């Protein structure tokens, strides 16, 4: 929707004669609905269709695009499932463009992590890998306006100290703002996803009957953020990084003192609290509350993959809710890839548990919407992956080491076949990352792996035309063999250094090939 400068009211955009509403080509290779969804998706992500714009009425679109209602509705459902559209019902409703944010990705990944028995200790390790370096980088890039924003966010923390949900929301906003200032979109997305999950555990700790412990945690956060602001004002990146590391260490120790560090995370209390405070909006509050309840039951293991829900009639009676509101709640879960709906009340619905591949799809959409380049993605890889590899080497098991030896031999056999080499390399990475024995770090590696899989066809197609690519493959295989040797000695420092060296070599490859400056959106197609 567009905004009227006189009234501030939201008005739907109108179909014009431009390319936005051109009729769809008729091709036999793909369904027209999928072509339309892909076309609109590209226009949303490139800004041709802006956030909060309302698409023209269904009748206008079908006429303009020369398609059926069923085809249009299927295309819009695809975009809704990708969090790029919101379908509003009732008078004044319609399809409204959305800018995908971190909320949906965070919620999905949190559910995935809880089902993998992730603990608070695992999340602490994730933060220690990602955040301190980003905090130091942020200080070097922060201007006066940025510092004022951080001060305002810090003031919000102070004012919300006695409100557990408000306080957790405020500290999450401050921490995310610091990471955003580091200037790497990929890092900001990944850190933001896991920070929201960590915040859920902080909420559980401070929203308790132990008022003294809750007050200690709140005060420690406020003092730590004040110290970081002092370092930022001095433009001291080293001090800022140390301050952030101390912040993570001290707050984590307070939580450890309450003997929760090794317990599996439980995100359900925060979800229920957030749903209970949902305001008025296009989605009924009862629908949001019910969707949160189903989400929580999946997280708690009460609903498992493939479980069938009761009929609409039985569910409506169980929750004392109207069928339209119930259907809206189920649609929310369907759009989050947590439910398979069937036509008709008797068909029921079945539960889908989350996967890292779907999480990567959701994260990829957010990266695309932010205009992330492949160079940005690769810089995040250079910062995150060596520490993970170092931890994996220090925790390697004989079985995993044997798998690494085998895949190293396969890499040596296919250095002249770039397409096969890249595919084998991705498999080798997954074996290495799985050795870290931290489900949260493994999920990060898997998400980045699946994003790379998305751009792999474009990378492979161009790489095969470069005359020196076989030499690059041989060098990568040599370094991987050195990593395996370091892992055999459980040499975490050596393994991390070898991995960093390999990534540095790849960085020059991307610069030479021109991939670095291309958008993730364009590479993923």
List each model region and its residues:
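Short linear motifs at protein or domain termini
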Residues: 1-125, 264-380, 524-525
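C-terminal all-alpha effector/ligand-binding and dimerization domain
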Residues: 11-15, 201-282, 301, 454-525
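Extended, hydrophobic interaction surfaces within ordered domains
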Residues: 23, 70-73, 77, 81-84, ...
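Short helix-capping and inter-helix turn/linker motifs at the boundaries of alpha-helical repeat units
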Residues: 31, 125, 165, 216-220, ...
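Regular secondary-structure segments
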Residues: 41, 45, 135-139, 151-158, ...
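Conserved amphipathic alpha-helical segments that form helical-bundle/coiled-coil interaction surfaces
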Residues: 127-133, 137-207, 242-252, 377, ...
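Intrinsically disordered, low-complexity segments enriched in Gly and acidic/Ser/Thr residues
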Residues: 336, 437-438, 450, 466-470
């Amino acid at each position: 929707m567009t905004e009227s400068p006189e009234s501030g009211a939201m008005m739907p955009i109108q179909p014009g004669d431009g390319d936005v509403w051109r009729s769809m080509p008729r091709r036999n290779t793909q369904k027209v609905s999928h072509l339309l969804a892909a076309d609109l998706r590209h226009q949303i992500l490139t800004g041709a269709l802006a956030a909060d714009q309302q698409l023209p009425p269904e009748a206008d679109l079908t006429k303009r695009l020369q398609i059926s209602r069923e085809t249009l509705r299927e295309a819009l459902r695809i975009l809704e499932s990708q969090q790029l559209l919101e379908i509003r019902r009732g008078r004044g409703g319609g399809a409204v463009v959305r800018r995908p944010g971190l909320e949906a990705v965070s919620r999905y990944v949190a559910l995935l992590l809880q089902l993998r028995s992730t603990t608070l200790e695992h999340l602490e390790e994730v933060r220690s890998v990602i955040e301190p370096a980003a905090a130091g980088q942020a200080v070097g890039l922060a201007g006066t306006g940025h510092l004022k924003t951080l001060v305002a966010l810090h003031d919000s923390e102070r004012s919300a100290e006695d409100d557990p949900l408000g306080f957790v929301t405020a500290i999450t906003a401050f921490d995310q703002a610091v990471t955003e200032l580091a200037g790497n979109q990929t890092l900001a997305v990944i850190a933001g996803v896991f920070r929201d999950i960590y915040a859920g555990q902080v909420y559980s700790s401070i929203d308790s009957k132990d008022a003294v412990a809750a007050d200690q945690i709140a005060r420690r956060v406020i003092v730590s953020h004040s110290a970081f602001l002092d370092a930022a004002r001095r433009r001291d990146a080293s001090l800022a990084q140390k301050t952030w590391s101390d912040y993570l260490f001290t707050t984590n120790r307070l939580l450890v003192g309450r003997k929760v560090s090794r317990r599996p995370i439980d995100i359900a209390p925060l979800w229920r609290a957030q749903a209970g405070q949902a305001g008025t909006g296009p989605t009924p509050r009862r629908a949001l509350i019910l969707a949160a309840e189903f989400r929580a039951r999946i997280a708690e293991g009460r609903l498992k993959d493939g479980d069938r829900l009761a009929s609409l009639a039985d569910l409506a009676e169980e929750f004392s809710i109207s069928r339209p509101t119930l259907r809206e709640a189920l649609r929310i879960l369907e759009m989050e890839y947590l439910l398979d709906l069937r036509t008709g009340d008797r068909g029921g619905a079945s539960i889908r548990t989350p996967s890292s591949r779907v999480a990567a799809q959701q994260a990829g959409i957010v990266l695309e919407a932010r205009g992330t380049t492949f160079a940005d993605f690769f810089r995040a890889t250079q910062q995150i992956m060596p520490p993970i590899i170092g931890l994996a080497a220090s925790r390697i098991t004989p079985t995993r080491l044997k798998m690494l030896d085998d895949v190293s031999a396969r890499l040596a056999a296919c250095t002249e076949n770039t397409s096969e080499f890249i595919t084998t390399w991705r498999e080798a990475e997954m074996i290495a990352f799985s050795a870290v024995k931290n489900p949260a770090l493994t999920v990060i590696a898997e998400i980045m792996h699946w994003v790379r899989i998305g751009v792999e066809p474009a990378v492979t197609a161009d790489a095969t035309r470069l005359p020196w690519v076989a030499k690059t493959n041989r060098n990568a295989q040599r370094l991987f063999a050195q990593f395996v040797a370091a892992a055999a000695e459980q040499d975490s420092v050596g393994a991390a250094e070898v991995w960093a060296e390999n990534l540095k070599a790849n960085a020059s490859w991307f610069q030479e090939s021109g991939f670095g400056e291309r958008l993730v959106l364009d590479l993923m197609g």
